[in-house]
Amino acid sequence: MEYTEVMVRYGELSTKGKNRKDFINRLASNVEKVLKDLPQIDFHPRHDRMHIVLNGAPFAEVDKRLKKVFGIQTYSPAIKIPKTLEDIEKTSLELMQETFKPGMTFKVNTKRSDHKFEYDTNQLNNLVGDYLFDHIDHLKAEMKHPDLVLRIEVRQDAVYISNQLLHGIGGMPVGTAGKAVMMLSGGIDSPVASYLAMKRGVDIEMVHFFSPPYTTEKALAKAKELTGILANYVGKINFIAVPFAEIQETIKEKLPEGYLMTVQRRFMLQLADRIRAKRGGLAIFNGESVGQVASQTLQSMVAINDVTTTPVIRPVATMDKTEIIKLAEDIGTFDLSIQPFEDCCTIFAPPRPKTKPKLDKAREYEARLDVEGLIQRAMDGIEVMPIYPNEKFINDKIEEDQDLL
């Protein structure tokens, strides 16, 4: 049967009290964004759920996209029918025949907001159940843990019947927690951190440092394409490319090898903070995991964080690498993340970086440089572009150019 609409149930929104309306409106806006190329769809957000009227749009495509909208707890494709027992029985049978397999158990679950309807919930459960028993062989009822639940909702305008309860990804609607910047590399961790930030309702913009001619066009394209994968969850993400070669060259030329990485990261954080302030963000997110590499020891974090009072949030800080990889595979970023295109974090990496850098030394070495001039020139060279779901940037020409190197 062709579904006519989808009933969307909210996740944590039920705990948000007086702000509930704002959260529901944001979720509705986010759902509209991911379905905007299906113009026939109508949206009706309500206090307890959202109705999406398909108007002929394919449910399979809608289903694929709703699975990636934060703030949805569950949803069910449904069929809207007239309020007659004959229509209810006929539609219930057709839905059950599509999904029932011998040996399965079932339950009819009726809810009624129209209390003037001629049958109460128990009567309708029994009538529909008896009708299904008469028309489907080997059908068994199970009240506690059935394999199939046929849900019937009697509302003022019509009856809605569904036979599936699909799970969303939960979390909070993106945008309800405010705006922040994400320091996106081309690796495994920062895309996962981006996903987790969005899941908590944060509207993120990607900040990516690139260092031509030391980094290739393909490395930049990889970061953009990772952003395109993550844009599936929100409809669009702004990508901010920051030129970083002059800063890296200057640090390498003038500072001791052991502190190259520490001072480089201090510059990155200062630039991210400038961009955050300029674009109205409230926090900085990154993909650091405690102790994973030299720059991510607690001592390194102290020496690097010193340059800002802005909250620096690390969603994967306490996760094992295997946990991060599993989540990267689940969200679809892993295969691209492991492509071997060197980014600016790897090309200037010293062979023996300090794992326990001293804050006073980091400040002393950084003070030898024209910090403000270097930062301002990098800020003058930033480029901002919107990236949409699944946009491709690693094209054949880039691959050919890479082969010639």
From Swiss-Prot:
It comes from the Bacteria. GO terms for biological process: thiamine biosynthetic process; thiamine diphosphate biosynthetic process; thiazole biosynthetic process; tRNA 4-thiouridine biosynthesis. SMART domains: THUMP. ATP binds at residues 183-184, 208-209, 265, 287, 296. Coiled coil: none annotated. Its EC number is 2.8.1.4. Pathway: Cofactor biosynthesis; thiamine diphosphate biosynthesis. Keywords: ATP-binding, Cytoplasm, Nucleotide-binding, RNA-binding, Thiamine biosynthesis, Transferase, tRNA-binding. GO terms for cellular component: cytosol. It is found in: Cytoplasm. Pfam families: ThiI, ThiI_fer, THUMP. Residues 60-165 form the THUMP domain. It catalyses: [ThiI sulfur-carrier protein]-S-sulfanyl-L-cysteine + a uridine in tRNA + 2 reduced [2Fe-2S]-[ferredoxin] + ATP + H(+) = [ThiI sulfur-carrier protein]-L-cysteine + a 4-thiouridine in tRNA + 2 oxidized [2Fe-2S]-[ferredoxin] + AMP + diphosphate; [ThiS sulfur-carrier protein]-C-terminal Gly-Gly-AMP + S-sulfanyl-L-cysteinyl-[cysteine desulfurase] + AH2 = [ThiS sulfur-carrier protein]-C-terminal-Gly-aminoethanethioate + L-cysteinyl-[cysteine desulfurase] + A + AMP + 2 H(+). Signal peptide: none annotated. GO terms for molecular function: ATP binding; CCA tRNA nucleotidyltransferase activity; tRNA binding; tRNA-uracil-4 sulfurtransferase activity. Catalyzes the ATP-dependent transfer of a sulfur to tRNA to produce 4-thiouridine in position 8 of tRNAs, which functions as a near-UV photosensor. Also catalyzes the transfer of sulfur to the sulfur carrier protein ThiS, forming ThiS-thiocarboxylate. This is a step in the synthesis of thiazole, in the thiamine biosynthesis pathway. The sulfur is donated as persulfide by IscS. HAMAP family: ThiI. NCBIfam families: tRNA uracil 4-sulfurtransferase ThiI. PANTHER family: TRNA SULFURTRANSFERASE (PTHR43209:SF1). Belongs to the ThiI family. This is Probable tRNA sulfurtransferase. It comes from Lactobacillus helveticus (strain DPC 4571). The lineage of its organism: Bacteria, Bacillati, Bacillota, Bacilli, Lactobacillales.
